[in-house]
């Protein structure tokens, strides 16, 4: 999806609203590149769980370069490079965990991050779904209660934004699209749901993800000698632009509403009790 004209300004204003409401200092924000080494990708286990969504970066084989240069060989659907050099990032938060593997944290912290992500979608593409997209996330790393509170606060922020933008929405418990839905990881995901999606007109535009101590154990990230818990609040920016365009049509109206949100008081810790989404940690099959 191309974001052009005034809708580009809408996206910038939307990001500014999110940054304001999550109240992070500038030093806690990072924009990641979209590349992972094949070793990092293997360490994540993504290709094991989601081989159908995996995207990799390949270069033309050196032996084929003269043929391409002379026009004797062309890039088409039948061309198969023999080596994969890098993998493409499927979710922004993975970079946060990879950067901290083997580390001991001194306190819980929240990281704001953004990156262009890639998934080889197996569903029809439209203005809400594409092979590449921009994912902005707010990731909590630390104590178990802090990770739960981050989800509640993220939900309260989403509630505030959608209410002020006058956008109808609902929360749905969601399961990641594992390739093998009978695998142990997929079965555990069903038994202990980790994700709520924010749904507008049948489209997921954001998600609340509670990983418990999965990434802390996997990457040996600790706090007080125990594996950390993690949670993240994720926003697909192109999906938000599509939603706002469908809802309003006129970017000027959206910019006015976002300017008011940029001055709104962020939800307090106590106000998260008003968040109406299902609490993941309390969900049972």
Show the residue positions of the predicted features:
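TRNA-recognition modules of translation machinery and tRNA-sensing kinases, especially anticodon-binding
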Residues: 1-282
């Amino acid at each position: 999806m191309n974001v052009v004209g005034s809708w580009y300004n809408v996206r910038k204003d939307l990001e500014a609203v999110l940054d304001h409401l999550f109240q992070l200092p500038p030093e806690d924000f990072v924009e990641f590149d979209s590349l992972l080494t094949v070793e990092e990708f293997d360490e994540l286990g993504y290709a094991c769980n989601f081989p159908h969504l995996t995207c990799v970066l390949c270069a033309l084989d050196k032996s084929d370069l003269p043929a391409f240069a002379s026009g004797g060989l062309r890039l088409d659907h039948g061309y198969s490079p023999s080596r994969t050099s890098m993998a493409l990032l499927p979710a922004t938060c993975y970079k946060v965990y990879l950067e901290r593997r083997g580390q001991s944290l001194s306190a819980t912290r929240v990281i704001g991050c953004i990156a262009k992500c890639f998934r080889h979608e197996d569903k029809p593409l439209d203005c809400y779904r594409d092979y590449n997209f921009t994912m902005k996330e707010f990731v909590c790393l630390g104590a178990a209660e802090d990770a739960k509170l981050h989800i509640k606060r993220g939900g309260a922020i989403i509630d505030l934004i959608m209410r002020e933008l006058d956008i109808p929405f609902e929360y749905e418990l969601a399961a990641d699209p594992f390739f093998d839905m009978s695998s142990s990881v997929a079965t555990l995901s069903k038994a202990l749901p980790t994700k709520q999606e924010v749904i507008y007109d049948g489209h997921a535009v954001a998600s609340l993800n509670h990983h418990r101590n999965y990434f802390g154990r996997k990457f040996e990230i600790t706090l007080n000698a125990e594996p950390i818990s993690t949670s993240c609040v994720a926003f697909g920016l192109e999906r938000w632009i599509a939603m706002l365009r469908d809802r309003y049509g006129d970017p000027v109206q959206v910019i006015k509403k976002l300017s008011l949100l940029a001055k709104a008081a962020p939800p307090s810790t106590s106000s998260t009790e008003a968040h109406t989404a299902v609490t993941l940690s309390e969900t049972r099959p």
